Amino acid sequence: VYNNDLAAYEENMECIEAVKYPYVVIAPSYMIYTQNYDELLKTHIESGADITLLYHSVDNAKEYYLNCSTLNLNKQKGVLSIEPNHGNAKNRNIFMDTYIMKKDLFIELIRKAKAISSAFTLADIINELHNELDVRGVSHRGFFASITDFQSYYNANMDLIDIKAAQTLFDPEWPIYTRTNDSCPTHYYETAQIRNSVVSNGCQVEGTIENSILGRGCIIHKNAVIKNSVVLSGAEIGEGVHVENQVVDKMVKILHVKEVVSDPALPGYIKRR
């Protein structure tokens, strides 16, 4: 386990140096967005900047993205600094932890950061040297979510129930390849009622589902009610059970407890035994 991003880069320096391509794109694993990196690289090269950083402008930074960094920009979208989001302003440019630069500069920054402090991150060394470098920001458009804690995971799932939001993330021309799981279509019984929900294949639904997400192969028995919840694959909700504002983990069975309801502002988590 690496203590920061630079430690990971340093550990894999031999592979990085062996790559023959002149540019690097560094992107995070915990942020969800769609971006054409060919276009972003072209923008970076045409701008003449040393480093290009991707950001997303939001108007709710007081309540959300509190574990993210922000970019302070000048009128020409030059980056003045990278700072933590302290939640003291609603309008912020959330840094998407996405960088483009020449590979040689990337390697140089890693070595300079290591010489200063083992605790330095890539953002730290860019902050340290931003007066010596031409660092520019490029604005991202479309769906964006940062999964930094349980609450943001829940919120991102709820946001993607909205078909308009989902369409800005998922593009038929850019298919997402995942594990194949061949199963039959979901079976909706006569007693089933579904409203504003996303239901995967292979489910059996006899109860009510409202504003929720169901993974593959879930079983929802008669008179069960699921509201504002994320139910992961293989879960079973028993007859007459009410589940609201929850994340239900894979293969969980809720059969005997008849009501599992949390505050909408503090959704609950039901783990598998």
For the regions a language model picked out, list residue spans one by one.
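Unchanged
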Residues: 1-157, 270-271
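Left-handed beta-helix
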Residues: 114-273
